[in-house]
Amino acid sequence: SSLVQLIPRLYDAESGTVRVGGVDVRDYNLDVLRREVSMVLQKNVLFSGTILDNLRWGDANATEEECIRMAKLACADEFIQRFPDKYNTWIEQGGSNVSGGQKQRLTIARALLRKPKVLILDDSTSAVDTATDAKIRKAFREEIPGTTKIIIAQRISSVQDADRILVLDNGQINGLGTHAE
């Protein structure tokens, strides 16, 4: 978790460099860097407003159709459709009227609306069941293949299909490779 916060420069590295696209993140314009990197945290934030309002925090100009498409990718559309007011359903401050897994899926959809070049998922599917997690990962592979995805997870199943898996233990690299390796 601390390591990935160096990518959008929430913190700067005390030594060494962090590179995105081969460029030191300190050489990027901070606004540009943060526009191109989306983070979804395990503990996420929803605001008072409709589901659409909350999704549009990712892109204020997103059409309803774009919001629905990203909600489908994040497996949020299936529960949104069960609400009487669908995408116009009111969300309480902090998302107190939706479950933890629903909050996570809404914040994933919101991050996808930004169309980031780098998507950081920090234990962001920990509150969803493994079947839904698998659907989300499949949608990522099929629908946003050009986006770099950095996934921090406790469940092996959440990262087993990753191109590279980095195992850290007390801040040290303990393993690097594919799941099969």
Which positions does each model-derived feature cover?
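ABC ATPase nucleotide-binding domain helical subdomain, centered on the C-loop/LSGGQ "ABC signature"
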Residues: 17-19, 27, 34, 52-93, ...
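Conserved catalytic loops of ABC-family nucleotide-binding domains
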Residues: 142-153, 159
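Conserved catalytic segment of ABC-fold P-loop ATPases
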Residues: 161-167
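Catalytic Walker B motif of ABC-type/P-loop ATPase nucleotide-binding domains
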Residues: 119-122
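Helix-to-loop junction immediately C-terminal to a conserved catalytic motif
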Residues: 7-8
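ABC ATPase "signature
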Residues: 176-177
